[in-house]
C-alpha cells in the first residue's frame, strides 16, 4: 500500500485551524481554479523524504484534471491536501488567490464531493447512505444519483429497495456496489468540486464504462480531480498530470502525452501491454 493511502478520514478532525473557525473566510472566490504553488509535504513532518516535492500545478475550474503515476508517487496525498485533511509543509494551495488554509473548512467541505479509497458506508438504509444528513430526501435527485452511478437496477431488485439496511463498511454489498453507492452519494450532493481517488477500480469494465459516460455529463460546470490508473478513466480528461516520486514528470492531454513517449506512455504501455 502507498504510505499516503493508509491515513484515515478521521485525520480531518485533528486539524488545528478548525479551532479558529470564526477567523476564516466564508465565501469562495468567483474563480474556482485551484493552484498548488511549490507544495512540499511529508506525513511525519520531517524536512526530508517528501511525499510531494516542490509541486506546482493548476487545476482549472469547470474542467476534468486527472492525476496518474506509479504506486507511492503522491497521487492520494494531493487529494488529501485538497480536501484539507493536511496542510502543505511548504508552499501553498489556493482557490484563485485565496489560501485554502484561510477558508472555513466547513464551507469548503460543503462545496465538495469525494469518493476516496477509505470512504465510509454507514450502518443505515441505502437512501440515507446516499443522502447523508438530509432530513427530507429529494427523490428526484436520489433517482438521478443512482442512475448516474448505474446502481438503480440493483437497489430496486431488493425487497426493501432504498430502505434496505446495509452495515458498517458496507457489509452485505460487494466492493463494486459500495463504490457505486459512494459515487451516487457524491452525485446526490451536486457539489462544485469533485475529487475521485480510484473511484471505479473495483468495477468491471461494463459498469465502469456506463458510469464514466454518465459522469461526463454530470461534470459539466464542475471542477473535477480524478486519481486513477486505468486508461479508460483518464484518457478523456481535459488535462493529465503525471507524478513520479512526488514530482511532476509531465502534463498534457492523453494524445499529447502518448506522442511524447515518456512517463505516461510507459505507464499506459505497461498497464495494457499493448506493445505500442
Indicate residue ranges for each PLM-predicted region.
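Single conserved hydrophobic/aromatic residue that forms the stacking wall/gate
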Residues: 2-13
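ABC-type nucleotide-binding domain
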Residues: 16, 25-276
Amino acid at each position: 500500500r502507498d504510505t499516503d493511502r493508509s491515513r484515515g478520514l478521521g485525520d480531518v478532525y485533528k486539524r488545528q485551524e478548525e479551532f479558529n473557525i470564526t477567523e476564516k473566510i466564508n465565501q469562495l472566490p468567483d474563480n474556482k481554479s485551484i493552484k498548488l504553488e511549490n507544495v512540499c509535504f511529508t506525513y511525519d513532518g520531517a524536512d526530508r523524504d517528501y511525499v510531494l516535492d516542490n509541486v506546482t500545478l493548476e487545476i482549472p475550474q469547470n474542467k476534468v484534471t486527472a492525476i496518474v503515476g506509479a504506486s507511492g508517487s503522491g497521487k492520494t496525498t494531493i487529494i488529501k491536501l485538497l480536501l484539507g485533511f493536511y496542510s502543505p509543509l511548504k508552499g501553498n494551495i489556493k482557490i484563485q488567490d485565496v489560501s485554502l488554509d484561510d477558508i472555513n473548512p466547513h464551507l469548503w467541505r460543503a462545496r465538495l464531493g469525494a469518493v476516496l479509497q477509505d470512504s465510509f458506508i454507514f450502518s443505515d438504509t441505502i437512501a440515507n447512505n446516499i443522502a447523508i444528513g438530509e432530513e427530507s430526501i429529494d427523490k428526484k435527485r436520489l433517482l438521478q444519483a443512482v442512475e448516474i452511478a448505474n446502481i438503480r437496477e440493483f437497489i430496486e431488485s431488493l425487497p426493501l429497495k432504498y430502505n434496505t439496511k446495509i452495515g458498517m463498511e458496507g457489509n452485505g454489498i460487494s466492493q463494486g456496489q459500495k463504490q457505486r453507492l459512494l459515487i451516487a452519494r457524491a452525485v446526490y450532493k451536486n457539489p462544485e468540486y469533485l475529487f475521485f481517488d480510484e473511484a471505479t477500480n473495483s468495477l468491471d469494465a461494463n459498469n465502469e464504462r456506463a458510469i464514466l459516460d454518465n459522469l461526463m455529463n454530470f461534470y459539466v460546470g464542475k471542477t473535477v480531480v480524478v486519481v486513477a490508473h486505468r486508461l479508460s478513466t483518464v484518457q478523456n480528461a481535459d488535462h493529465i498530470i503525471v507524478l513520479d516520486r512526488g514530482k511532476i514528470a509531465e502534463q498534457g492531454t492523453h494524445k499529447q502525452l502518448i506522442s511524447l513517449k515518456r512517463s505516461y506512455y510507459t505507464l499506459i504501455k505497461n498497464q495494457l501491454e499493448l506493445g505500442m
